């Protein structure tokens, strides 16, 4: 019994059931006693359209007021049930309503990159989209209808931690091969010249002194790792 995956956990909110959202029964990771996994579910995508409508119209449709705050509520309830300190969400590479909600109700976010054309383009896309998401979230958190919901929309405080560059070939000396290094430099430039200024204007950056303290200012990634499987 009990809730076994993220979709079933959200069902009371999205299917208007007369019951509250309950914590998910997480799977424990072998050899990692302090790590738990919330099982996903392909059916979560079925809620994408409904959530998108709710996030656009929740100010005028009371019947949808419980949806925008329900995902963060579920994660908080699940974390509290296991005395969890940190919740990490691995998001799909899309700009849909679920990702909009997940990112804007999180405390911090990292942007994973691969040294290729698509990540360069994605940097520009994020610079355009994330400020719009922030504007939506600012509006959502000020709506009385969402504040008074069963699952209130949380205070928005999302901040950018940095980028992680991965999936590239190494040459001798453990540095990226020249072809990959070209893309890496282009990504860094895009982050420095386009993404960071856009996030700064949207109040989505930490104080600059923090980035400098950890040597990740000026578009530098938090981590470069050719292949994460090599850490196992």
Question: Where are the predicted features?
Answer:
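Walker A/P-loop NTP-binding active-site region of P-loop NTPases
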Residues: 1-19
């Amino acid at each position: 019994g009990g809730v076994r995956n993220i979709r079933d956990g959200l069902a009371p909110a999205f299917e208007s059931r007369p019951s509250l959202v309950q914590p998910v029964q997480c799977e424990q990771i072998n050899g990692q006693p302090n790590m738990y996994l919330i099982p996903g579910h392909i059916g979560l995508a079925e809620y994408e359209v409904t959530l998108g409508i709710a996030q656009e119209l929740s100010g005028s449709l009371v019947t949808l007021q419980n949806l925008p705050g329900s995902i963060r509520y579920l994660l908080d309830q699940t974390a509290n049930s296991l005395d969890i300190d940190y919740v990490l969400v691995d998001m799909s590479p899309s700009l849909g309503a679920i990702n909009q909600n997940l990112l804007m109700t999180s405390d911090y976010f990292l942007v994973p990159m691969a040294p290729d054309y698509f990540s360069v383009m994605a940097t520009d896309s994020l610079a355009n989209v994330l400020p719009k998401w922030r504007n939506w979230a600012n509006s959502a958190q000020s709506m009385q209808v969402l504040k008074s919901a069963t699952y209130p929309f949380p205070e928005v405080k999302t901040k950018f931690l940095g980028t992680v560059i991965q999936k590239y070939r190494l040459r001798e000396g453990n540095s990226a091969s020249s072809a990959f290094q070209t893309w890496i430099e282009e990504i860094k430039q895009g982050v420095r010249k386009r993404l960071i200024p856009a996030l700064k204007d949207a109040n989505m950056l930490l104080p600059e002194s923090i980035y400098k303290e950890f040597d990740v200012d000026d578009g530098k990634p938090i981590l470069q790792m050719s292949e994460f499987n090599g850490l196992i």
